[in-house]
Amino acid sequence: MGFVKTREEVARLEKVLSRPRFVGAEMLTIDYLTTPDIVRSILPPGLEPAEEPLITAMVGRWRSNCVADFAGGAIYVAARHKNIEAAYVLAMFMDTDQAIMFGRDLFGEPKKRATSDLRHNGVSFHGYVERFGVRLIDIRAELTTDLGPATVQGAPTSTSRHCRRVTALAVKMILV
C-alpha cells in the first residue's frame, strides 16, 4: 500500500467516506446550567449566550465504517447568533488520529487528541477525558430511573436510553 492510489482505490475510499456510519455508541452526557457571564466568557466573538445558559459535557465511544473504533468527549455551549440558537462545540477530544482527521480536516470540528474512558457497572457510570495528564472532563453518575427511548437524531430508539437521576457528578473544564 503506497501513498499513490489507483482510481479504483480512490473510488472505494470516496464510497466509504460518502456514507459514514457511527454505530454501537455509548455516551454519558450531562447538561448543567451556569451563568450567562460564564458562557459569554468562553464564546467567540459573534456569538452570545442562548436564552438558557446551558453547558453539555459528554464522554463516549463509537464504532464506525470510516474511522474504526474510537473514544472521546466534547463540551457544548448553548449559543445564539442573531435569531438562531444552537449548540456551539467548544472542544472535541478524540483518542485516534483517524477520528480527529475525519472531523477536523473534513468538517472543521475543533478536535484535539486526548485519552478517554467510559465504564459502567450496573447503574454506576464513570467517564473521563484527559489531555497531557490533565483531567478535563470527569463524570460519575448513577443512572437509576430509565425514562425509555431517547429521541436523538440518527440514533436507533431501541438502544438510546436517557435517565433522570444522576447522583454523583464532577465536571472539570480547563479553558486555556
Name each model-derived stretch.
Residues M1-S64:
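Hydrophobic, proline/glycine-rich low-complexity stretches
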Residues K5, K15, K82, K111-K112, ...:
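Context-gated lysine
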Residues V10, I30, I38, I42, ...:
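Weak global preference for isoleucine
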Residues M27, A87-V176:
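Internal, well-folded beta-alpha domain core
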Residues D37, S64, K82-I84, V134-L136, ...:
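Generic "edge-of-domain/loop-turn" microfeature
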Residues P53, A71-G73, N121-V123:
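A generic structural signal for short beta-strands and their flanking turns/coil linkers
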Residues R61-F107:
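Hydrophobic/aromatic-rich structural module bridging two neighboring secondary-structure elements via a short loop
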